[in-house]
Design a protein with these regions (language model features):
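Membrane-interface helix-loop junctions and terminal tails of multi-pass membrane proteins
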Residues: 1-221
């Protein structure tokens, strides 16, 4: 749903953060009572660290998330067949895209620091999102508004992330779309998503893990 509906909505209009946030809210109230609606390996890793799920459950969840990201990317591309190049140069795939190439001194921002920027942004925004998820799902919280809180948090981080790297904070979404781009685009020089996939896998997982550890320390459990 995140890859198919949210990315599809973001592709066809200028409101990408809302597409992702509303997609999560819809799923939270649809399947949240069944699976807690992680939809993101970084979230599942944080829950594993907090001992909210077993290792076997974690592997099942992550496997389903990765499959969902790949299948959703495939369906979206199938619905827009003939436009793979346009589709996967857009919000669907995660690539670093610094808003400027050089500063006033002529320093090229696409050197090594360009990738450090991406790693840092992915780490910090995933940390914020997963921390908000854990807080909203804490049993101490009362009410049934967790899905709205988490969806709004996703809108917040996506709003900033679109500026840097096409809005990921989700390894499953990033990997699925990158693999489809890799298989479908003829020009290997355009396959930047798969070449940069380590950023969108490692940084969100690290951010999710740190969020789980920090939340556990602050919550005293």
């Amino acid at each position: 749903v995140i890859t198919y509906a949210a990315c599809g909505g973001a592709l066809l209009n200028d409101y990408a953060p809302f597409a992702f946030g509303f997609a999560y809210i819809a799923m939270a109230y649809s399947v949240g009572n069944i699976s807690d609606c992680h939809l993101n390996p970084a979230v599942s890793l944080a829950c594993l660290i907090r001992k909210k799920m077993s290792l076997i459950e974690f592997l099942y969840y992550v496997g389903a998330q990765l499959f969902g990201g790949l299948f959703g990317s495939f369906l979206l591309g199938l619905c827009l067949r003939g436009y793979w190049g346009v589709l996967y140069s857009s919000i669907v795939t995660n690539k670093l895209r610094h808003p400027y190439k050089k500063d006033k001194n002529g320093w090229n921002r696409q050197d090594g620091w360009y990738y450090v920027d991406g790693l840092l942004v992915e780490f910090l925004l995933t940390f914020i999102f997963v921390f908000a998820f854990l807080g909203a799902k804490d049993p101490k919280q009362e009410g049934k508004h967790q899905g709205i809180v988490i969806g709004l948090s996703l809108i917040l981080v996506t709003n900033m992330e679109c500026y840097f790297a096409n809005a990921s904070v989700n390894p499953a979404k990033a990997l699925g779309s990158a693999l489809i781009e890799w298989f479908e685009l003829d020009d290997p020089n355009n396959n930047r998503a798969i070449k940069q996939i380590y950023i969108f896998m490692a940084a969100p997982l690290a951010g999710g893990a740190c969020a789980g550890l920090v939340y556990g320390l602050l919550a005293g459990d």
